[in-house]
Amino acid sequence: MAIPADIANALYGAWRLARLDRGGLAFFDHGETAFWRSFRAAFIAYPAFLLLLPLGPGDSGTTDWVRVLLVETIAYVIGWTAFPLVILPVTRILGRESLWLDFIIVYNWSQVLQYGAILAIIAVSLSGLAPPVLQGGLLYLAYLAVFAYEGFIARIVLNISWPAAGMIVLIDFVLGRLISVTAESLH
């Protein structure tokens, strides 16, 4: 099955941005239609999310996996929809509201690469290819790389300073943790 051109272009653009190549922005569509279509990235990243679920917190012997799957899937959808809503007034405060759609388009497609990178690092750790002493460090470095990637995207798409980009990354992190902790409390 062939990947639709707009998806392939967006993922290629996200890859180029991960390499800190601003030219990656040229591969993203713009406008309201592209904004709504960028949420297809949530469906593409969902299998990686599902693979990461058993690695999260939980009591292995008594876990009701159907309940966990339902709660975590709802949390996943909330995460994909809450961040754009929270960031809209932030872009307004920063005087960059006109770039909000473009930012969310790029942010959404970048999530596919982020899930893939975290999944790959965890796979290497679980496979035993990395010495035990490095396993936690690899994951820590992967998360730092994800934060830097998101900051780079915020900086170049919204044309803002590094501190403002860092604030957006922090908002994303705090919102994500809030949603995760809430979901975990409902298992």
What are these regions (language model features)?
Residues 124-187:
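Terminal transmembrane helical module of multi-pass membrane proteins
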